[in-house]
C-alpha cells in the first residue's frame, strides 16, 4: 500500500473571512485521503476565528520538517514567498491557492482547490523550477531577509 501523502498548509495574516476556506480545503484533503499538516501559526489564526482544526489534520511548528510531500500556500503571492522562505532548501513543491483578489504566483482559486487536490493525489502535475533570490542587509528592519522569485 502506498504511503498517504502529507500536504503542508501555510497562510499568513489571512483575512478572518478566509479562515473557513482553509478549513474547507483541509476537509477536501481528508476526504481525498490526504493528510493536511497545518503550520501552528495558521492553526492559531483558525482558533482565533472560532474555526477549530478538525481531527485528522496535524498541527506542527515547522511543516517543512514534518515529512511533507507538497505544500499548499493559502493566501496570495506574499504568502507564497513566505512559504518558500519557510521551506528553504528542502525542495518541497509549493502550490498556491489564492484566497484573495489577485495572484500571479498563486493562480489556483479556492473554487479549483478540489481539482488541484485530486491532481496532486493522482500525480497529475508538473513542477516548475524557479529561481529564488534573497536580500540581506544592515538597513533592513529587524535584520529580516527579503526574498523574491
Would you name each region that the model predicts?
Residues 1-14:
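Generic N-terminal amphipathic, Lys/Arg-enriched alpha-helix
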Residues 14, 77-79, 102:
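Short glycine-rich anion-binding loops that position phosphate/pyrophosphate groups of nucleotides
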Residues 17-18, 43-49:
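Short, charged/polar "capping" segments at the starts of alpha-helices
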Residues 18-19, 78-84:
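Short glycine/serine/threonine-rich phosphate/pyrophosphate-binding segments
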Residues 33-42:
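Short internal beta-strands
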Residues 54-68:
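Short acidic low-complexity segments
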Residues 90-108:
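Short, acidic/small-residue loops that bind anionic groups at enzyme active sites
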Residues 102-149:
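Catalytic core of DAGKc-family lipid kinases
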